[in-house]
Amino acid sequence: MRNFILLFVAALFVGCASSGVQVTTDDEKSQAIKAAYDGYLANDFSASNELYSDDTAIYINSVESISSEENLAAFSSHHDFYSDISMSNGGVDGAYIQTSVYGGELGTWTHAWFIWKGTGNASGNTFEVPCHVAYQWGDDGKVAQTWFFSDQSNHLKELAAAGVEL
């Protein structure tokens, strides 16, 4: 009986052990990304400017990085080509944002999933695009790299309708 009790207590402690990955949605990093998204929707990039360092690598559907200045200029231009820009997830306004602390070499990542929606000013078409963005945080508390994944085909069509040569 004593061995059974010891085995039960040992199993209880092992069962309660942390998996090593900690996931949160209301932490400081998730809130910083949410503030940047709220700013994007209002065409105000001051919160975004606070996220990036001078050497942040940003990848948009590519293995070739762009600078944070190029990234912010591209996202700001959305307001030139679209109206009624919104982000939602599962019918809820805003993006779903979570931060995962992996530890070791993997570090801390914040992920965002959302449906981007906007009406093209040139075409009048409304587009909905599923998006996933992953932000890796550096030791300095700034975003070290960003990976943005979405289908850009509708955006390219809208740019063509607006007469932009690519």
Predicted stretch roles:
Residues 28, 45-110:
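A solvent-exposed, acidic/Ser-Thr-rich amphipathic alpha-helical stretch
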Residues 142-166:
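Low-complexity, intrinsically disordered terminal/linker segments enriched in charged
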